[in-house]
Swiss-Prot record:
The keyword Transport is assigned to this record: yes
Annotated TM spans: 33-53, 77-98, 113-133, 178-198, 226-246, 288-308, 320-340, 347-367
Keywords assigned by UniProt, alphabetized: Electron transport, Heme, Iron, Membrane, Metal-binding, Mitochondrion, Mitochondrion inner membrane, Respiratory chain, Transmembrane, Transmembrane helix, Transport, Ubiquinone
PROSITE patterns xref list: CYTB_CTER (PS51003), CYTB_NTER (PS51002)
Recorded topology in the membrane: Multi-pass membrane protein
GO cellular component terms, A-Z: mitochondrial inner membrane; respiratory chain complex III
Annotated protein name in UniProt: Cytochrome b
Disulfide bridge positions per record: none
Necessary cofactors: heme b
Length: 379
């Protein structure tokens, strides 16, 4: 008799995706991040749902409703900090997942890679709108500054900003619609994840060697489910340590002050996971140029499949490309640091140099290094 997981029309889909899925036998811990991101997304949706039960999307009561959640709701403080720090954990895993994709040449799966970029934009939009909801000083002013960037769009910019605000400034209408979008987007993200999955399972997973692994596959369960559980335990240990010992470590103290449109914070900045893009935005003196650079800093990922000139897919046996990737990583850390600093000398200059280096490394140097490695292979 056929096993139910192989015959039942619904369970059969799950079986082919998570149990009997043929997986390369040599994939490392770097392939854990997909499952960890899925768990993180589930955690964010559940905690967010419980927070939404107590939160009020009104400029007068939003700040006090968050205080009420932390003080009066059973384990409200835990739910709130799990949600806030869960977002940070989500982005850490997301950046590692993208980094692994670049290192091992997973971007050659074009459909999977492009859906991944779309997912990144959706997650960034969700996180930005979530940051506005507590209605602290940084929430309100962050929303004002970032939405105001759209006014740089020729002809329709100002109208578009006022349309998003629902008035002539960030106010109750803005907060209400941001809450509506922040609530609905996390239910659209799993749909995009399913498409991401679908395209990945069309081609099969990549592996550290970058070679075709059709001749050497093993079932996903139990080998990689055990490995994923190990990754989950490490992730939960890190997240719970952050939540229970230093819940405000990654937050901004200004957000514990209720929003006041008459008092500007000394330094407006987004959450830490957007600082690299914010630094690129600030490094260009022109408003429209800054907005374009901000969008391109993420959209440049879509060019990776076209920029790949190497005869090898993975960077495992390409030491020069490895050095270049680690230089790019260091550059991103510098941009993140600069994004959190005030707009003054020498931070402006460092930010501009790091921004130029970011695009120059990806668009030009990586191609030259790949061609050089191809030459070396012929010797």
């Amino acid at each position: 008799m056929t096993h139910m997981r192989k015959s039942h029309p619904l369970i059969k889909i799950i079986n082919h995706s998570f149990i009997d899925l043929p997986t390369p036998s040599n994939i490392s811990a770097w392939w854990n991040f997909g499952s960890l991101l899925g768990i993180c997304l589930g955690l964010q949706i559940i905690t967010g749902l419980f927070l939404a039960m107590h939160y009020t999307a009104d400029t007068i009561t939003a700040f006090s409703s968050v205080t009420h959640i932390c003080r009066d709701v059973n384990y409200g403080w835990l739910i709130r900090y799990l949600h806030a720090n869960g977002a940070s954990m989500f982005f850490i895993l997301l950046y590692l997942h993208i980094g692994r994709g670049i290192y091992y040449g997973s971007y050659t799966f074009m459909e999977t890679w492009n859906i991944g970029i779309l997912l990144l934009f959706a997650v960034m939009a969700t996180a930005f709108m979530g940051y506005v909801l507590p209605w602290g000083q940084m929430s309100s002013w962050g929303a004002t500054v970032i939405t105001n960037l759209l006014s740089a769009i020729p002809y329709i910019g100002t109208t578009l900003v006022e349309w998003i605000w629902g008035g002539f400034s960030v106010d109750k209408a803005t907060l209400t619609r941001f809450f509506a979008f922040h609530f609905i987007l996390p239910f659209i993200i799993p749909a995009l994840v399913m498409i991401h999955f679908f395209f990945l399972h069309e081609t099969g997973s990549n592996n550290p060697s970058g070679l075709n692994s059709d001749s050497d596959k093993i079932p996903f369960h139990p080998y990689y489910t055990i490995k994923d559980i190990m990754g989950l335990l490490i992730m939960m240990l890190a997240l719970m340590s952050l939540v229970l010992f230093s819940p405000d470590l990654l937050g901004d103290p200004d957000n514990y002050t209720p929003a006041n449109p008459l008092n500007t914070p000394p330094h407006i900045k987004p959450e830490w996971y957007f600082l690299f893009a914010y630094a690129i935005l600030r490094s260009i003196p022109n408003k429209l140029g800054g907005v374009l650079a901000l969008v391109l800093s993420i959209l440049v990922l879509a060019l990776f499949p076209m920029l790949h000139l190497s005869k090898q897919r993975s960077m495992t046996f390409r030491p020069f490309s490895q050095c270049l990737l680690w230089m790019l990583t260091a550059n991103l850390f510098i941009l993140t640091w600069i994004g959190g600093q005030p707009v003054e000398y020498p931070y402006i200059t460092i930010g501009q140099l790091a921004s130029i280096n970011y695009f120059f490394t990806i668009l030009i140097v990586s191609r030259l290094v790949s061609l050089m490695e191809n030459k070396v292979l012929k010797w």
